[in-house]
Amino acid sequence: MSYSHSIKDCQEPDTVYYDILIPFKPNDQGFSPAIFQAQLTQPIVHNPSEYFLSVVRFSIPTQNIPLTIPQIQPYPNTNVNNTIYSVSIGYNGTYSSQNFVQFDPSLTSPNIPAPNAPTVTSPNVEVTPYYYIYDYSTFLQMINTALENAFNEISAPVGADAPFFFL
């Protein structure tokens, strides 16, 4: 803790800096909750109502924050990898069925166990690190697989390659 010099007629400084560091210590699920606890023997300021609080600087390790967490279809769906996102393709009056993007854990975190499937009593899938996606290309691969499945469903010869997204 550091203080600047006071210019008022009181004994407390004009500015008080209180530095806090919360280290990243992941647990077995990969989480690191931002918790700070301090037991001080004296107050930081004696009359807090005379002060304003500002967060002057902070740093977050963004490589540990997922870019997206796909939403999984609720019950009656029982496939924990069946997302709510879908694609369909049509060509010359021939259409594919609705192909849902399948979450592929082998592209993200193959060692994390899958959550429980949705049930009548618990219709939504629990969001766990199993679903964390840290880069765009991983999610695009999942979309491309759904596009390829839709393309292959069209029985008429299209005369083109399957559409894909690239990053």
UniProtKB/Swiss-Prot annotation:
<protein>
    <recommendedName>
        <fullName>Uncharacterized protein V18</fullName>
    </recommendedName>
</protein>
<dbReference type="InterPro" id="IPR049413">
    <property type="entry name" value="V18/19-like_jelly_roll_sf"/>
</dbReference>
<dbReference type="InterPro" id="IPR049412">
    <property type="entry name" value="V18-like_jelly_roll"/>
</dbReference>
<dbReference type="Pfam" id="PF21507">
    <property type="entry name" value="V18-19"/>
</dbReference>
